[in-house]
Curated annotation (Swiss-Prot):
Protein name: UPF0342 protein stu0643
Organism placement in taxonomy: Bacteria, Bacillati, Bacillota, Bacilli, Lactobacillales
Domain of life: Bacteria
Organism the protein comes from: Streptococcus thermophilus (strain ATCC BAA-250 / LMG 18311)
Gene3D superfamilies (UniProt xref): YheA/YmcA-like (1.20.1500.10)
HAMAP family: UPF0342
Database matches in InterPro entries: Com_YlbF (IPR010368), YheA/YmcA-like_dom_sf (IPR023378)
Pfam family, one: Com_YlbF
Similarity-based family: Belongs to the UPF0342 family.
């Protein structure tokens, strides 16, 4: 049997070789070269992290926070570079979700 860590490292290399991953890297690089998109991306990710942290802590978002999420989402959707990045991220997440399901299958079987 192969070493589990070798398999994990091989999986990492496989993910990096996926066309969807390479496309996502290209989209991220395009954002980095555009000041407006880069600033909006940072604002979006910072807000998203804060929002999720509050949710995990059991704090429900206020009406103002919900409105801010919608407003920020509209700004992101209006920016072509960010919209392309999020679409590419979604494409890669299909693979990652499938991989996660496969990896955790033995643990799920133990709980059944």
């Amino acid at each position: 049997m192969r070493n589990i860590y070798d398999l994990a490292n091989e999986l990492e290399r496989g993910i990096r070789a996926l066309p969807e991953y390479k496309n996502l890297v290209e989209k991220k690089e395009a954002i980095a070269t555009d000041a407006e998109a880069s600033a909006l991306f940072k604002e979006f990710t910072d807000f998203q992290e804060d929002f999720y942290a509050k949710m995990q802590a059991g704090t429900m978002p206020t009406a103002e926070e919900q409105a801010a999420v919608q407003e920020l989402g509209q700004k992101v959707e209006a920016n072509a570079l960010l919209k392309e990045y999020l679409t590419a991220q979604q494409s890669l997440s299909v693979y990652l979700n499938d991989i996660e399901r496969i990896i955790f299958k033995p643990l799920q079987e133990l709980n059944n």
